[in-house]
């Protein structure tokens, strides 16, 4: 599928295209434009220098709407196809990580949202316009970014996170073991996995490694000393240290990582993973009963006027603090 396409005489980023198919209305948001690198954060306008470089006419940019606002209504064709009510307002759009951050009420500089599914993400809010000169992280306009209130979402992604843990479960751990029991088995190994280290970069090129594809590697195995429990623990420790490597990049950009907000899901269900992450980074980890779909619902609620602003949305339920 093409992620950016021309519709008539206007350009649609993927979320704009979906909204257009639902409503017949073509518009965009600053957040959406920033995902395609079409927004100039320093001057708070469309990135003319990029448009000029590629020879794009400014007329290709669709009407820019506020992130939380009516951006069209579901038309008859889409309603019939999807079983939605015709005329339902479309009032919010964003990517998965801004949605996750919204669900966790992460809005202000220094606040951090994280996930650890197939890939791992650390998403921090920056109050200054700066960047990593090596482009090892992505920067977007966060959901509450505005002229005069810089709120940039800086996204660190580690491709080899839960996918490594699931690979270990399939190929190393005892057959039929649950993730919960696998965590208990890993806890039998000492901190540091008795000298085994695993670099978890086996799921394609890593942005934080400057787009290098190093592959996953396992180091330090002693055939007379190590067993399944050591390898399982080493995998989780390797993932944690890859998080730490990326978090150091974010801190160099001026984003202090002192508290990490995360949903009670995926690898954050592992006591070993979250306790190791807290110990290595020095950050407090808070787990909440929420996910990105809740963030999307809250965003739509703000856009339609159910909530007056971000400060009026409810806090998620905190499950634990590590």
Feature map (PLM): residue ranges:
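Single conserved hydrophobic/aromatic residue that forms the stacking wall/gate
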Residues: 2-8, 13, 311-322
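Active-site nucleophile and cofactor-binding loops and adjacent substrate-binding regions
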Residues: 9-10, 14, 31-33, 63-69, ...
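ATP-dependent carbohydrate kinase catalytic cores
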Residues: 38-148, 174-180, 184, 192, ...
């Amino acid at each position: 599928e093409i992620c950016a396409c021309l519709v008539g005489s206007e350009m649609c980023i993927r979320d704009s295209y979906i909204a257009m198919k639902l409503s017949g209305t073509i518009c965009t948001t600053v957040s959406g434009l920033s995902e395609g690198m079409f927004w100039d954060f320093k001057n708070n306008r469309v990135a003319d220098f990029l448009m000029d470089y590629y020879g794009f006419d400014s007329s290709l940019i669709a009407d820019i709407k506020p992130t939380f606002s009516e951006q069209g209504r579901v038309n008859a064709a889409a309603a019939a196809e999807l079983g939605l009510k015709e005329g339902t307002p479309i009032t919010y759009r964003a990517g998965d990580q801004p949605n996750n951050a919204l669900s966790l009420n992460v809005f202000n500089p220094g606040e951090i949202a994280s996930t650890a599914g197939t890939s791992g993400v650390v998403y921090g809010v920056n109050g200054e316009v700066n960047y990593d000169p090596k482009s090892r992280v992505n920067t977007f306009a966060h959901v509450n970014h505005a002229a005069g209130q810089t709120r940039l979402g800086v996204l660190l992604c580690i491709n080899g996170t839960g996918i490594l843990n699931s690979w270990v479960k399939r190929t190393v751990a005892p057959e039929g073991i649950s993730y919960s029991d696998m965590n208990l088995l890993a806890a039998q190994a000492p901190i540091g996995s008795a000298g085994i280290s695993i670099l978890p970069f086996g799921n394609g090129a890593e942005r934080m490694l400057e787009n290098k594809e190093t592959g996953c590697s396992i180091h330090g195995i002693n055939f007379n000393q190590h067993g399944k429990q050591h390898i399982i623990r080493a995998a989780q420790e390797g993932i944690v240290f890859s998080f730490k490597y990326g978090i150091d990049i974010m801190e160099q950009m001026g984003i202090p990582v002192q508290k990490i907000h995360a949903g009670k899901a995926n690898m954050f269900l592992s006591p070993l993973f979250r306790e190791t992450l807290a110990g290595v980074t020095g950050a407090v980890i808070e787990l909440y009963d929420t996910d990105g779909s809740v963030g999307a619902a809250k965003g739509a609620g703000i856009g339609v006027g159910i909530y007056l602003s971000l400060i009026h949305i409810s806090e998620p339920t905190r499950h634990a603090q590590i």
